[in-house]
């Protein structure tokens, strides 16, 4: 099987062009000028007879066997109109390059960064349908093409093999022209994909773009709590009071209610103070059984009036005032099932940037990383699709919560959120994560956090066949390989 493919490589150092051409032996390679990139490529594609075209803007070469891999892949995926792959970077002192793994097609992530990389194949038919590269967007032509393709292509495919090898890590440093072009490209994309706003364009290629909330729907914040004071580090505190007070004082979104499921041991003065803090937003639900987080959440959902339910632990402290807007805007996406937040431990390290399921392991993305750790491919900095999120802070459309059956009471303390996420994606819904909803989470300060073997047996008994799900986070133990 041969692949009908034409590469267009930007003119640069003659040796770099020569190295790439040698690595692409068997395919047509045409050199184009950066100054007239769009015009040169569009004219060349118009004259081309290749089935696929690829513009290479980077110093690197195809990995050995890359063309054969691409050929096999497109023959196995004849409907693919966009194909991109993992990459590799040579590391000084090491024989093998380091792999730069990428997620599968992630539309919300794409509006925040052009993560496709240097090797992106477009079917010539799609390239022509899109009108080719836009000459009015110098410095952002390739990103703009990917954004436009994402709105019309029904098959954007990822090859989880490093087919492009760079001699050094790619460093993105957009000049003023490229920043302006990127802004215009993203403005057009957001307008065509449901709306949104651009907070900032990053010269490093990471852009703060956000969806916008439609209307002002009621959010029911469901908080299971014992409702008592406890001593932590020698100080008596009541976590649910602190959590509710922080939300009331800091949140910029105000159409919410607190559905607080309180144990029978709840202190009367705590209940009274909750009423004082939350006023008519406070809904008290009584709980008279042994601890079961799942059952308490489900009971709270029965009493919830909101169009959306926010599952929330009582041992949290809000950081970002606009957290509800950031989560709600994603929860309003057409196929949204759940949205998670960025959680930090009290020592400022990351606790949660999404769930990662890898090689039969379920764990938190970013666990124990430094507060400002950007994550592999800047994954801690961008809104993105994920395989799951923690129920310590998760927003769901109420209808979806009930459709999936809520949380299973067979998992009273652990892995109930894993099960909930699995059920949500099993029914075809998308799960998102945002770094713009930030909270401290004082991990299980008010309950026994031990994991029981029965919980492992139940969760893995149900979902072990899906406990390797590297689509959106392709890193073992949620760390990049290296």
Question: Language model features by range: what are they?
Answer:
Residues 96-125, 295-296, 358-399:
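A recurrent flexible, glycine/aromatic-enriched loop bordering the glycosyltransferase active site
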Residues 19-31, 240-255:
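Short, acidic, metal-binding catalytic loop of nucleotide-sugar glycosyltransferases
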Residues 1, 176-219, 347, 359-386, ...:
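C-terminal, non-catalytic tails of nucleotide-sugar-dependent glycosyltransferases
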Residues 131-147, 317, 383-440, 446-449:
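Donor nucleotide-sugar recognition loop
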Residues 35-48, 287-304:
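Glycine-rich, basic loop-to-helix element that forms the pyrophosphate-binding segment
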Residues 147-166, 187-200, 210-211, 409-412, ...:
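Catalytic donor-sugar/metal-binding loop of nucleotide-sugar-dependent glycosyltransferases
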Residues 53, 309:
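Short aromatic/hydrophobic "clamp" motif used to bind/position activated sugar donors
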Residues 65-97, 169, 316, 320-360:
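Conserved donor NDP-sugar-binding/catalytic core segment of glycosyltransferases
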